[in-house]
């Protein structure tokens, strides 16, 4: 279950974790996540429902947005540039952070984010997750990447770059890792150089 965004003690708990992370990792960037949040239990939570009524919220997405806003401001107070998954983008009240776009089944999302003036990093699920089974189609999609017409309305100057990732829960050893990552990483590198 996700953390309850309506209890003050949960904010204190998360902030204490952030404090520890900031001490350990000196990067100027701090990614707060906020993806794939299962919100069904917030619909049933009396504390969440009470907060929604007090704040005039219509949807539980607004609870996540509130949580992201508070955590974003907290992390910024630590002198960090804040990043979060595009799941955290709520169009009517976007947060001032760098969005990491992964949900490629929402092709309008990069346009919505960048038109509001927010920076974005592309990390599309189907294209830039190098843990997918290697295929000619996968390589082709990397080599043939174009912003348009796939991402309507995108403001290219707000695209900071691209990021590839590998989730290793289905990759049992180094040999298999190499098969997944190469030559996709070369294609990804070329794509990144061409489009930025």
Each language-model region and where it sits:
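Active-site neighborhood of glycoside hydrolase catalytic domains
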Residues: 2-95, 104-105, 110
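Hydrophobic faces of well-ordered beta-strands that scaffold small-molecule active sites
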Residues: 30-32, 82-84, 99-101, 120-123, ...
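Histidine/acidic-residue-rich catalytic or RNA/ligand-binding cores of hydrolases
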Residues: 41-46, 93-95, 130-139, 174-178
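Short, hinge-like loop/turn segments at secondary-structure boundaries
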Residues: 48, 100-102, 138-140
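Catalytic grooves of carbohydrate-active enzymes
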Residues: 154-182, 186-190
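Conserved small/polar residues in nucleotide/adenosyl-binding loops
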Residues: 194-196
């Amino acid at each position: 279950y996700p953390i309850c965004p309506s209890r003050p003690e949960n904010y204190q708990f998360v902030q204490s974790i952030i404090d520890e992370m900031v001490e350990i990792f000196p990067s100027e960037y701090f990614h707060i996540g906020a993806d794939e949040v299962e919100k069904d239990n917030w619909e049933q939570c009396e504390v969440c429902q009470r907060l929604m009524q007090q704040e005039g919220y219509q949807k539980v997405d607004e609870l996540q947005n509130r949580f992201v806003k508070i955590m974003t401001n907290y992390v910024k107070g630590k002198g960090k540039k804040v990043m979060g998954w595009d799941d955290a983008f709520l169009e009517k009240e976007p947060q001032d952070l760098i969005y990491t776009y992964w949900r490629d089944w929402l092709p309008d999302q990069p346009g919505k984010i960048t038109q509001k003036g927010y920076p974005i990093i592309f990390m599309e699920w189907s294209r830039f997750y190098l843990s997918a089974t290697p295929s000619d189609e996968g390589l082709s999609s990397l080599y043939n990447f174009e912003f348009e017409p796939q991402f309507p309305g995108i403001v290219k100057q707000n695209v900071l770059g691209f990021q590839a990732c590998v989730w290793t829960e289905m990759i049992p050893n180094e040999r298999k890792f190499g098969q997944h990552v190469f030559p996709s990483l070369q294609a990804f590198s070329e794509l990144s150089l061409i489009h930025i």
